[in-house]
Amino acid sequence: VLSPADKTNVKAAWEKVGGHGAAYGAEALERMFLSFPTTKTYFPHFDLSHGSAQVQGHGKKVADALANAAGHLDDLPSALSALSDLHAHKLRVDPVNFKLLSHCLLVTLAAHHPAEFTPAVHASLDKFLATVSTVLTSKYR
């Protein structure tokens, strides 16, 4: 459960992401593909090379979904319901991959905003991404 301080930290961090969301999302995906090569199996039709339009496009989708979630912290299940259905029933993504991408997102955000990435902000973002991951996997059961 996100505390009021966590919610404040998440909203502030996402405001700092601003117009860089698509680039950060793509960078996090690239980090994930390089660090955890098995995740590539979910994207057999993608050009996974650095800077590819497909990775950039999916990075934007990831960033947009997280921005939407950050704007609906009090009702994440409703905000992410369609995305949860998609990943559980159509794409059938192994839930562990959400944790891997979350880790790569944290690394990306820390790399771009080191001064703002305090231990408290890190903890809040980690809780936020873990909560998003839980919601996305809730329809697997």
Swiss-Prot record:
The keyword Transport belongs to this UniProt entry's keyword annotation: yes
Annotated family: Belongs to the globin family.
Coiled coil: none
GO terms of molecular function: haptoglobin binding; heme binding; iron ion binding; organic acid binding; oxygen binding; oxygen carrier activity; peroxidase activity
InterPro entries in the record: Globin (IPR000971), Globin-like_sf (IPR009050), Globin/Proto (IPR012292), Hemoglobin_a-typ (IPR002338), Hemoglobin_oxygen_transport (IPR050056), Hemoglobin_pi (IPR002339)
Record-linked Gene3D superfamilies: Globins (1.10.490.10)
Subunit structure, as described in the record: Heterotetramer of two alpha chains and two beta chains.
Residues modified as N6-succinyllysine: 7, 11, 16, 40
Residues found modified as Phosphothreonine: 8, 108, 134, 137
The entry's keywords: Acetylation, Heme, Iron, Metal-binding, Oxygen transport, Phosphoprotein, Transport
Protein name: Hemoglobin subunit alpha
Any single Pfam family the record assigns to this protein: Globin
Binding residues for heme b: 87
Tissue and organ distribution: Red blood cells.
GO biological process: hydrogen peroxide catabolic process
Residues the record lists as N6-acetyllysine modifications: 16
CDD domains reported in the protein's UniProt record: Hb-alpha-like
Keyword field contains rRNA-binding: no
Protein function: Involved in oxygen transport from the lung to the various peripheral tissues.
Modified positions (Phosphotyrosine) in chain numbering: 24
Span of domain Globin: 1-141
Phosphoserine modification, residue list: 3, 35, 49, 102, 124, 138
Binding site for O2: 58
Source species, domain of life: Eukaryota
